Amino acid sequence: MKQTILSFLMFVLAMPFCAQEKDTRHEVLLETTAGNIRIALYNETPLHRDNFLKLTRKGFYDGVLFHRVIPNFMIQTGDSLSRYAHPGDRVGDSPEYYQIPAEIVYPKYFHKRGAVAAAREPDKVNPQRASSASQFYIVWGRKHSDASLDNIQKNMTKATDGKATMPAEQREYYKEVGGTPHLDAQYTVFGEVLEGMEVVDKIQQVECDENDRPCDDVRIIRATVIR
């Protein structure tokens, strides 16, 4: 019965993508030292989509590290100078010359496992929640209890002035599959992994130093627009 419910949830959550975007979404292939990850970019976040496509076509992501990896949370990449980092260097703070206005399409796009979202500076210095020009993360996350989700909803209500409410089907997804719901409605989710979640899993389990940088470099060898 539990597996049936989970299968139904996955089907329901995928329906909008299949019905509306199956033939129109751009796709990018990330060839990494841990394996390949294929992602789709959402058309409802056009500024992030177009920026990501532009950077990919310029070769911006070729050679950059996954510089911040936290198990049962996410893997982050996109720091322009990380490709030149020496072992043990702290990376992730390279200067950026622009930001992308937030395109938070919640609750349609949420921090499910496999979500691709834009990193950003904290609310204190970035109240508009504008996104990093290049850094992004892929969600792994964990399963959550009802008590955990109740607490997250309280924090979400406060962070969004009561504008965001977690739908019942998302609560079930977070309980059955997992993700990072505490980031919902506050960070721009602009894509999702189509293939290669086993690679994401492999990366999120690697040994890291005190700065969450993998002890053995994991990098994007090449990023290519494939659709």
Where are these regions (language model features)?
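Cyclophilin-like peptidyl-prolyl cis-trans isomerases
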Residues: 17-227
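Bacterial Sec-dependent N-terminal signal peptides
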Residues: 1-22
